[in-house]
């Protein structure tokens, strides 16, 4: 996507293929080549110099030292011990000890909308069956890994599974379980250890049947030492299990990789971000365009609940449908369920995924009977009049109409902005569909505030970066933000 008015499609598992990974070539700056680049574009300039700088990946060349370090066990340590607070160092030969950094520093950890996985959460490794969508890639001639998926001075890559065995990489990090980020991961994966959040690790086993021996789950807000580099996962406010990844190198250099995220005020209170230096920010720039200024998640949820109640007052026999991806948008249908006091119907595959979260708010409110509740969750691709009409026919004895919500940032309109009451639904016969701008990515204004809060030395966009002109527009925004 460039700075035009055309929206990108999102795939059935969550996000769009956001870094141009379907293209076959890269430009001279290491970005995926885009044919839309103008022929008369200047070869030199800020963007060119910026992206050429620091792109020497000789540090990733595999050598004996790297190979040796890759087989060492991951070490986990407490930040308060490093800072002189009293706590015994964990014995790395014993089972890994988990320490909440917020508790260590005497801070109260913000609670998410839904409950985090408890210690009693069930862990399942059963597979959902074969995926209709093949997320594998050709092993015969895998494309070279783009530089912006590698971390300089480390043997690490982030969300770089479709490139096969990346030379010099001894640790593959996954920010979250959306297909455009895990593409390339299959049960046959054998290229190296995978590091991700605990919830994401359960989804890898459940949905993709990835070998558990390849997966190394990390808890949020716990510092780990991997190949001598300190790594901490931070809540990303995107989808369940999504994490920002904070890397601190031996020389003190700090990288923050956002994966996909929605910036929030709570992030600014995190001990690793508040008054801390970030040298390089790998930024989710999905909506890095001045036209995007989303209403808050809370405002959208309140709007959805109000519309639902108003609709039911007029037509009590209404079936409520919420579109969703494999994961994501849970807050929307959970808000409706709580407001109406009803359970949530989803098919068996989705129920297994939702139950794997270990969140009581969802697990206790799931129904196996579509006739027993008026709230159904369907794939986002099913939110079309024809498909909803077919769905209604199945329950025609209980319901006479359908009210559906398509919650995605791509429904955003500048004319509506934050004025949600201006939204006009699509209505045909017994079907009414509301597109609501419930985004799990940062809006332009939220990106600006986050960048101005962190004030990094360098920003590397990870989305919509396949066009040099678009990159220059984004860099122009970054320069303007950091002047203030």
Swiss-Prot record:
Q: Would you tell me the Gene Ontology cellular component terms?
A: nucleus
Q: What is its main location?
A: nucleus
Chain intervals with Polar residues compositional bias: 109-127
What does the record note about the induction of this protein?
Answer: Induced by bleomycin, methyl methane sulphonate and hydrogen peroxide, which are known to induce oxidative lesions in DNA. Also induced by bacterial flagellin, which is known to elicit plant defense responses and a rapid oxidative burst, and by xylanase.
Q: Does the keyword Isomerase apply?
A: no
Q: Which GO terms describe its biological process?
A: DNA repair
Q: Which residues form a coiled coil?
A: none
User: Would the keyword DNA repair turn up in this protein's UniProt record?
Assistant: yes
**InterPro entries the record matches:** DRMBL, RibonucZ/Hydroxyglut_hydro
Query: Residue ranges of region Disordered?
Result: 1-27, 109-141
Q: Where is the composition biased (Acidic residues)?
A: 1-11
Query: Which Gene3D superfamilies does this UniProt record tie to the protein?
Result: 3.40.50.12650, Ribonuclease Z/Hydroxyacylglutathione hydrolase-like
Q: Which domain of life is it from?
A: Eukaryota
Compartment(s): Nucleus
Record keywords:
DNA damage, DNA repair, Nucleus
The protein's role, per its UniProt record = May be required for repair of DNA lesions formed after exposure to oxidative stress.
The family this protein is said to belong to: Belongs to the DNA repair metallo-beta-lactamase (DRMBL) family.
- Name of the protein: DNA cross-link repair protein SNM1
Q: Which taxonomic lineage does the organism of this UniProt entry have?
A: Eukaryota, Viridiplantae, Streptophyta, Embryophyta, Tracheophyta
């Amino acid at each position: 996507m460039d700075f035009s008015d055309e929206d990108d499609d999102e795939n059935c598992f969550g996000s769009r293929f956001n870094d141009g990974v379907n293209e076959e070539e890269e430009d001279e700056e290491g970005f995926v080549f885009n044919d839309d680049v103008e022929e008369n574009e200047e070869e030199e300039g800020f963007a060119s110099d910026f992206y050429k700088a620091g792109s020497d990946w000789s540090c990733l060349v595999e050598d004996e030292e790297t190979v040796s370090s890759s087989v060492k066990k991951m070490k986990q340590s407490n930040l308060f011990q490093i800072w002189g607070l009293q706590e015994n160092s964990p014995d790395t030969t014993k089972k890994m000890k988990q320490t909440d950094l917020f508790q260590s520093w005497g801070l109260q950890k913000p609670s998410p909308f839904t409950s985090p996985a408890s210690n009693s959460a069930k862990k399942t490794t059963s597979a959902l069956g074969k995926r209709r969508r093949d997320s594998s890639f050709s092993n015969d001639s895998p494309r070279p890994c783009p530089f912006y998926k590698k971390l300089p001075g480390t043997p690490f890559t982030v969300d770089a599974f479709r490139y096969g065995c990346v030379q010099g990489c001894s640790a593959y990090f996954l920010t979250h379980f959306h297909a455009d980020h895990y593409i390339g991961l299959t049960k046959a994966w054998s290229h190296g250890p995978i590091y991700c959040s605990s919830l994401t690790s359960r989804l890898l086993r459940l949905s993709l049947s990835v070998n558990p021996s390849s997966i190394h789950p990390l808890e949020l807000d716990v510092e780990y030492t991997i190949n001598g580099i300190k790594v901490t996962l931070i809540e990303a406010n995107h989808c369940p299990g999504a994490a920002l990844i904070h890397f601190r190198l031996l020389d003190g250099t700090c990288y923050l990789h956002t994966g996909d995220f929605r910036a929030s005020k709570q992030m600014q209170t995190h001990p690793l971000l508040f008054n801390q230096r970030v040298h390089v920010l790998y930024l989710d720039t999905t909506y890095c365009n001045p036209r995007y200024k989303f209403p808050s998640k809370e405002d959208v949820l309140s709007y959805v609940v109000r519309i639902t109640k108003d609709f039911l007052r007029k037509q009590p026999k209404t079936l409520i449908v919420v579109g969703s991806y494999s994961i994501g948008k849970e807050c929307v249908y959970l808000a409706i369920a709580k407001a109406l006091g009803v359970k949530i119907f989803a098919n068996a595959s989705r129920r297994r995924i939702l139950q794997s979260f270990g969140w009581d708010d969802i697990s206790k409110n799931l129904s196996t009977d579509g006739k027993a509740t008026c709230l159904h969750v369907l794939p986002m691709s099913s939110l079309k009049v024809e498909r909803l009409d077919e769905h209604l026919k199945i329950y025609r004895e209980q319901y006479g109409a359908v009210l559906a919500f398509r919650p995605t940032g791509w429904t955003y309109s500048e004319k509506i902005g934050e004025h949600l009451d201006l939204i006009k639904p699509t209505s045909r016969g017994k079907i009414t569909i509301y597109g609501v701008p419930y985004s799990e990515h940062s809006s332009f204004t939220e990106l600006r505030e986050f960048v101005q809060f962190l004030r990094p030395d360098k920003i590397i966009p990870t989305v919509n970066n396949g066009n040099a002109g678009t990159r220059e527009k984004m860099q122009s925004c970054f320069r303007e933000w950091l002047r203030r």
